């Protein structure tokens, strides 16, 4: 069953589970899927404060976990420059804000549609597409590259970062051919990621990608819309 993430109310807690109890509001990362349902089994979750909407809570887990995980793996520190491909996506938006808050300079390769947003979040936008390496190089040296787009940018990424070890991709299947790490979600690979980002969201210090809603019964239509590539917002499926 599809569904990497979901938000809802705890129905029951398994043996030995601590930190939550029936009736609690939570959002969960579902690495074994199952979010497209009324009930799901979760092992990675965080509480939902009252100040956070259900829609924002549902939109947080997978993107937040990925952003935190890759930034930790890259070990980018204050004063360094991070090049981010896919800065206008749900992962990129969170990664930009986390990096900027840590004193990291972010160059965000985005479409024309997302340039203003990247700038608003504290990044320097560059137009994605042919010639992007030259446009980035004109801004100065790059210390690390976070590829959240997975669209054939690894050769440019390595040239800009200076070595494959400072490049990580979330989804480019050619990663091994370039000696680049393909980062995948696994239990406990980014401990505390949901707690950290939920706290920022509750404090108004984290912005998420814009989203729209559709009823669960229209899940197939939601996927058809996403496959067109023309949807600039996340689609959140809701249950009555």
Explain the meaning of each model-derived region.
Residues 64-128:
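Mid-domain Rossmann-like dinucleotide-binding core that forms the NAD(H)/NADP(H) cofactor-binding site
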Residues 148-209, 216, 239-240:
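Glycine-rich phosphate-binding loop and adjacent beta-alpha segment
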Residues 131-140:
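Short amphipathic alpha-helix with an adjacent loop that forms part of the alpha/beta core around
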Residues 205-209, 223-240:
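C-terminal capping/lid region of NAD(P)-dependent oxidoreductase domains
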Residues 20-21, 76, 161:
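Short, well-ordered loop/turn sites that connect or cap secondary structure elements
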Residues 1-32:
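Glycine-rich beta-strand-centered segment in the early N-terminal region that forms part
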Residues 5, 26-86:
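NAD(P)H dinucleotide-binding glycine-rich loop of Rossmann-like/cofactor-binding domains
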